[in-house]
């Protein structure tokens, strides 16, 4: 069955494995995960849990009302006896019997050695050319060349008389939802609500990431 949790990417560091191997890891903090809703096949047509992450900022300290949450959001969170959440995600194909409304989902959901998929929003690079954005080759950089980093031909002449859709051209790069599959959980620190993931994960520091059981875990 699938397991899932939301967290924030803290950064990267290195740890030593049992055999002395130096392993690059990404530190993900995953606290304040609360089950907001349970969905069952009988009622909703599929099994899933809805998890909220991080409380929305209140209007003022000690106030019951929330500046950044409307009444539907407050009512939805109230059913789980919790505060309105900033991020809400749904995890399908889970064993809903293992979860209760308002239950906190902690990092011990995963164990050392688990194979996971991590989803995040890639770093935004702004407007970039075709070479950086799509990996196209450049022209000669000599003084006699008139073609250095230009994208080159984008289509045919009179036969088509247009540029086809999907042509790789300069444009906005990054800021896309990216999933890196088959990463290994190196360590789970329940005391600090931290998961160490082997390798790098998408997004900048403090970026939101979604950790789920690997959909291809049998392939590694």
Curated annotation (Swiss-Prot):
The terms describing its cellular component in GO are: cytosolic large ribosomal subunit
GO biological-process terms attached to the record? translation
- UniProt GO MF annotations: rRNA binding; structural constituent of ribosome
**Which parts of the sequence are annotated with region: Disordered?**
61-81
Keywords from the named record: Ribonucleoprotein, Ribosomal protein, RNA-binding, rRNA-binding
List the SUPFAM superfamilies.
Translation proteins (SSF50447)
How it assembles, according to the record, is:
Part of the 50S ribosomal subunit. Forms a cluster with proteins L14 and L19.
Q: Which family does it belong to?
A: Belongs to the universal ribosomal protein uL3 family.
HAMAP family listed in its UniProt record: Ribosomal_uL3_B (MF_01325_B)
General function of this protein: One of the primary rRNA binding proteins, it binds directly near the 3'-end of the 23S rRNA, where it nucleates assembly of the 50S subunit.
NCBIfam families assigned to the protein according to its UniProt record, in alphabetical order = L3_bact
Identification of the protein by name = Large ribosomal subunit protein uL3
Query: Organism, per UniProt?
Result: Staphylococcus epidermidis (strain ATCC 12228 / FDA PCI 1200)
Q: Which gene encodes it?
A: rplC
């Amino acid at each position: 069955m699938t397991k899932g949790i939301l967290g924030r990417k803290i950064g990267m560091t290195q740890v030593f494995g049992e055999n002395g191997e130096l392993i690059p890891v990404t530190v993900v903090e995953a606290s304040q995960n609360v089950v907001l809703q349970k969905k069952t096949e009988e009622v909703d047509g599929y099994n899933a849990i809805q998890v909220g992450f991080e409380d929305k900022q209140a209007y003022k300290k000690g106030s019951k009302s929330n500046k950044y949450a409307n009444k539907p959001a407050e009512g939805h969170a109230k059913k789980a006896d919790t505060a309105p959440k900033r991020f809400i995600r749904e995890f399908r194909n889970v064993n809903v019997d293992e979860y209760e409304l308002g239950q906190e989902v902690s990092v011990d959901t995963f164990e050392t050695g688990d194979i996971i998929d991590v989803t995040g929003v890639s770093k935004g690079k702004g407007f970039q050319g075709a070479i950086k954005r799509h990996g196209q080759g450049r022209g000669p950089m000599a003084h006699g060349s008139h073609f250095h980093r230009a994208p080159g031909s984008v289509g045919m002449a009179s036969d088509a008389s247009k540029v086809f859709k999907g042509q790789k051209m300069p444009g906005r790069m990054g800021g896309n939802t990216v999933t890196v599959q088959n990463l290994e959980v190196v360590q789970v620190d329940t005391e600090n609500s931290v998961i160490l993931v082997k390798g790098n994960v998408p997004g900048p520091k403090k970026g939101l990431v979604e950790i789920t059981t690997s959909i291809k875990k049998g392939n590694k």
